[in-house]
Amino acid sequence: MRIGHGFDVHKFGENGSGPLIIGGVRIPYEKGLLAHSDGDVALHAATDALLGAAALGDIGKLFPDTDPAFKGADSRALLREAYRRILAKGYRLGNLDITIIAQAPKMAPHIPQMRVHLAEDLQCHMDDINVKATTTEQLGFTGRGEGIACEAVALLIKVEQA
């Protein structure tokens, strides 16, 4: 078994800068996150956790923000490509736990769909995926509504060869 940790943060743009995409879900909100890709902090943290567990570097190494090919990239596609590499290395997901840190908008109504997307992309059961959200009680940049942060922990299991 191998454990990986991922972290990501993105700053909000101005009003009308949307869309806001978290966990592969488009969330109604007046601001989007500024990023080279679609800015999905949950999927970026999850991808980093998975890559870290497999010792495959990080999302910035695999999909550099200096490469125009990844401008506006769908983070679900990046996650699927990272997981393809993990499978090729002989590992599969054991479980994934994600914590979204945001003062607003409320994430709870969107978490079930986030779990569905993650289970689809990682070819696993929804019971292997946990997503939760918290605030920082109006402290720090997330508490002031300047951006969203996310942490993820992934467990990979070595696939037995027949």
Swiss-Prot record:
Positions bearing the site annotation: Transition state stabilizer: 36, 135
Protein residues bound to a divalent metal cation: 8, 10, 44
Highest taxon above the source species: Bacteria
Keywords: Isoprene biosynthesis, Lyase, Metal-binding
Enzyme category, top tier: lyase
The reaction(s) this protein catalyses: 4-CDP-2-C-methyl-D-erythritol 2-phosphate = 2-C-methyl-D-erythritol 2,4-cyclic diphosphate + CMP
EC number: 4.6.1.12
Gene Ontology MF term list: 2-C-methyl-D-erythritol 2,4-cyclodiphosphate synthase activity; metal ion binding
Protein's pathway: Isoprenoid biosynthesis; isopentenyl diphosphate biosynthesis via DXP pathway; isopentenyl diphosphate from 1-deoxy-D-xylulose 5-phosphate: step 4/6
Cofactor binding notes: Binds 1 divalent metal cation per subunit.
Cofactors, names only: a divalent metal cation
Pfam family, one: YgbB
A GO BP entry: isopentenyl diphosphate biosynthetic process, methylerythritol 4-phosphate pathway
Record-listed 4-CDP-2-C-methyl-D-erythritol 2-phosphate binding positions: 8-10, 36-37, 58-60, 63-67, 102-108, 134-137, 141, 144
Role played: Involved in the biosynthesis of isopentenyl diphosphate (IPP) and dimethylallyl diphosphate (DMAPP), two major building blocks of isoprenoid compounds. Catalyzes the conversion of 4-diphosphocytidyl-2-C-methyl-D-erythritol 2-phosphate (CDP-ME2P) to 2-C-methyl-D-erythritol 2,4-cyclodiphosphate (ME-CPP) with a corresponding release of cytidine 5-monophosphate (CMP).
Quaternary data: Homotrimer.
Entry's family note: Belongs to the IspF family.
Annotated NCBIfam families: ispF
Name by which UniProt lists this protein: 2-C-methyl-D-erythritol 2,4-cyclodiphosphate synthase
